[in-house]
Amino acid sequence: MASYGQTCPRPMCIPPSYADLGKAARDIFNKGFGFGLVKLDVKTKSCSGVEFSTSGSSNTDTGKVTGTLETKYKWCEYGLTFTEKWNTDNTLGTEIAIEDQICQGLKLTFDTTFSPNTGKKSGKIKSSYKRECVNLGCDVDFDFAGPAIHGSAVFGYEGWLAGYQMTFDSAKSKLTRNNFAVGYRTGDFQLHTNVNDGTEFGGSIYQKVCEDLDTSVNLAWTSGTNCTRFGIAAKYQLDPTASISAKVNNSSLIGVGYTQTLRPGVKLTLSALVDGKSINAGGHKLGLALELEA
């Protein structure tokens, strides 16, 4: 995402991947909130360059505790990244990625997962290619019934973005996903619209009002229904170490969050979700998250 007060050169810089279209608006709605969870994230790096990331959370409604552990090592000389993953469902994952070695802008990733409890295995080959004005992606999910192919393309010029995303299920010999998106992006404004499978329509607007205030509007509608989903969110930077976030939707769900950097590498987030239609009935949710990084 471009920074405030800057615009992309013409022709524009590398466009985002399809999954990242509209990301600036989504981040205002999602980051700084953690309703119904008590969460701890820890990140550290060894002297040899190995990165360790661990995360644990407890659901305040169900009491269920989940956790993940990830180690990552980058061999920069050869553009290689090795990643090992584990979670409390006892699923093991291995990922090997190589970037900018075969050709500039090309990244290849081989991703596997294995569950010792069930014996289930999965494999995926991911590829992405990004250059000025274009961002392409192709992933292949391997399955015993037949591989599924995911493809995407985003083209950009002078701030305008156009993207297409599809999934072809070889077992069924048909397209199972067919999505389009159009958007416009400048340094402090982003507009994104999308159509998913011809039935789901959505749009979002991101606006950096000033250096300390970011706002976002989100709209979604599904054909065949009278239900339109609408939301407004904002984030205000109180000072370099603290920020407050708020959002509300047409279901009268009101969310607020407060993030404070206690010291370098230590961040605390408090959040609350209030049902505006039944304030006295209860059912509201609180959240607490602590991030440690060294």
From Swiss-Prot:
Which cystines does this chain contain?
none
* Residues that bind NAD(+): L253, I254, G255, S271, A272, L273, V274, D275
Q: Does the keyword NAD apply?
A: yes
Record field: transmembrane: 37-46, 50-58, 65-75, 80-87, 91-100, 106-115, 122-131, 134-141, 148-156, 161-169, 174-186, 189-196, 200-209, 213-222, 229-238, 242-249, 253-262, 265-274, 284-293
Q: What is its main location?
A: mitochondrion
- Kindly state which keywords UniProt assigns to this record, in alphabetical order: Acetylation, ATP-binding, Ion transport, Isopeptide bond, Lipid transport, Lipid-binding, Membrane, Mitochondrion, Mitochondrion outer membrane, NAD, Nucleotide-binding, Phosphoprotein, Porin, Transmembrane, Transmembrane beta strand, Transport, Ubl conjugation
- Please name the InterPro entries in this protein's record: Porin_dom_sf, Porin_Euk, Porin_Euk/Tom40
What PROSITE patterns does the database record attribute to this sequence? EUKARYOTIC_PORIN (PS00558)
Location comes to:
Mitochondrion outer membrane; Membrane
GO biological-process terms attached to the record: lipid transport; mitochondrial outer membrane permeabilization; monoatomic anion transport
Q: Which residues carry this modification: N-acetylalanine?
A: A2
List site positions: Involved in ceramide and phosphatidylcholine binding. K85
Q: Which GO terms describe its cellular component?
A: membrane; mitochondrial outer membrane; mitochondrion; pore complex; sperm midpiece
Please outline how this chain is modified post-translation.
Ubiquitinated by PRKN during mitophagy, leading to its degradation and enhancement of mitophagy. Deubiquitinated by USP30.
List residues, modification N6-succinyllysine.
K31
User: Self-association or partners: how does it assemble?
Assistant: Monomer, homodimer and higher order oligomers; formation of higher order structures is necessary for scramblase activity. Interacts with ARMC12 in a TBC1D21-dependent manner. Interacts with KLC3. Interacts with SPATA33. Interacts with PPP3CC in a SPATA33-dependent manner.
Q: Which family does it belong to?
A: Belongs to the eukaryotic mitochondrial porin family.
PANTHER family assigned to the protein according to its UniProt record, in alphabetical order: VOLTAGE-DEPENDENT ANION-SELECTIVE CHANNEL, VOLTAGE-DEPENDENT ANION-SELECTIVE CHANNEL PROTEIN 2
The record's function comment reads:
Non-selective voltage-gated ion channel that mediates the transport of anions and cations through the mitochondrion outer membrane and plasma membrane. The channel adopts an open conformation at zero mV and a closed conformation at both positive and negative potentials. There are two populations of channels; the main that functions in a lower open-state conductance with lower ion selectivity, that switch, in a voltage-dependent manner, from the open to a low-conducting 'closed' state and the other that has a normal ion selectivity in the typical high conductance, 'open' state.
Domain comment, as recorded = Consists mainly of a membrane-spanning beta-barrel formed by 19 beta-strands.
- This chain's protein is named Non-selective voltage-gated ion channel VDAC2
What organism is this sequence from? Answer: Sus scrofa (Pig)
